[in-house]
Amino acid sequence: MGAIMQANENMGSKLPKTDGKVIYLAGGCFWGLEAYMERIYGVVDASSGYANGKTQSTNYQKLHESDHAESVKVVYDPKKISLDKLLRYYFKVVDPVSVNKQGNDVGRQYRTGIYYVDNADKKVIDNALKELQKSVKGKIAIEVEPLKNYVRAEIYHQDYLKKNPNGYCHIDLKKADEVIVDSDKYTKPSDEVLKKKLTQLQYEVTQNKRTEKPFENEYYNKEEEGIYVDITTGEPLFSMADKYDSGCGWPSFSKPISKDVVKYEDDESLNMRRTEVLSRIGKAHLGHVFNDGPKELGGLRYCINSASLRFIPLKDMEKEGYGEFIPYIKKGELKKYIHDKTH
């Protein structure tokens, strides 16, 4: 009999559930954490259980005796998502300094924890927590231990929020839709390399803050689904899902693909007061952001030079190493379809 393939389109992986790497995460009530993890690209499967108690067996009614933590077994494809990135998604939805309490749930069974089965994961976990500690006040209370005495939870608890869409959930599931772009994947080439790699216009725009002509640039009216990356480094910047026609003659976006991939500087050139937008790693001049965008899209207009961007079509994103961002492009298609049908 062949392996049963994971069918959830949000997971981005066709790895059999029995393959991949495994990590066990505790973060309060497991109903919400399980549903949240299932939304993350690269996760193959998530299931609820009880971890690191005193006994080899337990059930929901006996947790106060066995001291198990409500946990989620996460099977993930390391080719799609790293453990470090998975943990950063986990950190988004837990209070890391709270002891035995998450959301409205109080008790030892609701403690936070990361339980590993591969000893090599311990270093990754420790480094991730060290980075997290820099951004939070108070001592981190997330326990880190090798997995022991794990018990799969009762059928009633598995996929609880799928079976009960309006059921209790202390987690904001939308945080799984927030894009994390790894900065260490991208580097800025030397000026010598950039001069060879870029056209004269691309170099002048990105390095010397020039502006290309409106309506005479490559992407201002492009409607194909895909992703726009920094022409100098390849770092993802904008999704077609957030592109709209502002009539200004340059590509316009309601927001970057992640708030972390752009930087801002005051620009008082040309006797105007504007906010310049630069790429995070390449520090390339991209354009400017204005507050005259559509209110229903957040009210911002990122007016970006085509010369600062490289477009990668949806069909090529996987082979060019941007497969992890495909779900956000597809969500954009759905959003656009719904908008068109209701307006």
Swiss-Prot record:
Residue ranges of the region described as Peptide methionine sulfoxide reductase A: 21-174
GO cellular component terms, A-Z: cytoplasm
SUPFAM superfamilies on file: Mss4-like (SSF51316), Peptide methionine sulfoxide reductase (SSF55068)
Gene3D superfamilies hit by this protein: Peptide methionine sulfoxide reductase, Peptide methionine sulphoxide reductase MsrA
Extent of the signal sequence: none
Any GO molecular function: peptide-methionine (R)-S-oxide reductase activity
Substrates-to-products reaction catalysed: L-methionyl-[protein] + [thioredoxin]-disulfide + H2O = L-methionyl-(S)-S-oxide-[protein] + [thioredoxin]-dithiol; [thioredoxin]-disulfide + L-methionine + H2O = L-methionine (S)-S-oxide + [thioredoxin]-dithiol; L-methionyl-[protein] + [thioredoxin]-disulfide + H2O = L-methionyl-(R)-S-oxide-[protein] + [thioredoxin]-dithiol
Catalytic residues as annotated in Swiss-Prot or TrEMBL: 29 (cysteine sulfenic acid (-soh) intermediate), 303 (nucleophile)
Keyword Transmembrane: no
GO biological process, one term: response to oxidative stress
InterPro entries on file: Met_Sox_Rdtase_MsrA_dom, Met_Sox_Rdtase_MsrA_sf, Met_Sox_Rdtase_MsrB, Met_Sox_Rdtase_MsrB_dom, Mss4-like_sf
Keyword Electron transport attributed: no
EC number: 1.8.4.11, 1.8.4.12
Domain of life the protein comes from: Bacteria
Swiss-Prot/TrEMBL keywords: Multifunctional enzyme, Oxidoreductase
Domain MsrB: 191-314
PANTHER family: METHIONINE SULFOXIDE REDUCTASE, PEPTIDE METHIONINE SULFOXIDE REDUCTASE MSRA_MSRB
Family note: In the N-terminal section; belongs to the MsrA Met sulfoxide reductase family. In the C-terminal section; belongs to the MsrB Met sulfoxide reductase family.
Role of this protein: Has an important function as a repair enzyme for proteins that have been inactivated by oxidation. Catalyzes the reversible oxidation-reduction of methionine sulfoxide in proteins to methionine.
UniProt-listed NCBIfam families: msrA, peptide-methionine (R)-S-oxide reductase MsrB
Name of the protein in its database record: Peptide methionine sulfoxide reductase msrA/msrB
Species for this entry: Enterococcus faecalis (Streptococcus faecalis)
